[in-house]
Amino acid sequence: MATPGPVIPEVPFEPSKPPVIEGLSPTVYRNPESFKEKFVRKTRENPVVPIGCLATAAALTYGLYSFHRGNSQRSQLMMRTRIAAQGFTVAAILLGLAVTAMKSRP
């Protein structure tokens, strides 16, 4: 059995340069977005998600208000509505991801 010798890399490593990985081209963001800019961009790309989030928050708020006032039937209805709004929001997110994935394909 032959023992392997020392491994000599094909390209010498230079600490001053970033590592080279085949098939990877890192991108450097030259103009980072602020929170507001990113929120507006994402809302324009998929406007249904914020609507679903607002519907979920509204149903939760009104349901808690009804519970506090002692109206248990209305409170239960709002909690069920909240679950439906959450499902709608998750479906909108998944649909948005699918559309984005289809757009990025050549």
UniProtKB/Swiss-Prot annotation:
It comes from the Eukaryota. It holds the Pfam family HIG_1_N. Keywords: Acetylation, Electron transport, Membrane, Mitochondrion, Mitochondrion inner membrane, Respiratory chain, Transmembrane, Transmembrane helix, Transport. The keyword Protein biosynthesis does not apply. Its main location: mitochondrion. InterPro entries: Hypoxia_induced_domain, RCF1. It is found in: Mitochondrion membrane; Mitochondrion inner membrane. One of its GO terms (biological process) is mitochondrial respirasome assembly. It is a multi-pass membrane protein. GO terms for cellular component: mitochondrial inner membrane; mitochondrion. Residues 104-106 are mitochondrial matrix. The chain crosses the membrane at residues 47-67, 83-103. Residues 20-106 form the HIG1 domain. The modification N-acetylalanine is found at A2. Proposed subunit of cytochrome c oxidase (COX, complex IV), which is the terminal component of the mitochondrial respiratory chain that catalyzes the reduction of oxygen to water. May be involved in cytochrome c oxidase activity. May play a role in the assembly of respiratory supercomplexes. Associates with cytochrome c oxidase (COX, complex IV); proposed complex component. PANTHER family: HIG1 DOMAIN FAMILY MEMBER 2A, MITOCHONDRIAL, HYPOXIA-INDUCBILE GENE 1 HIG1 -RELATED. This is HIG1 domain family member 2A, mitochondrial. It comes from Homo sapiens (Human). The gene is HIGD2A.
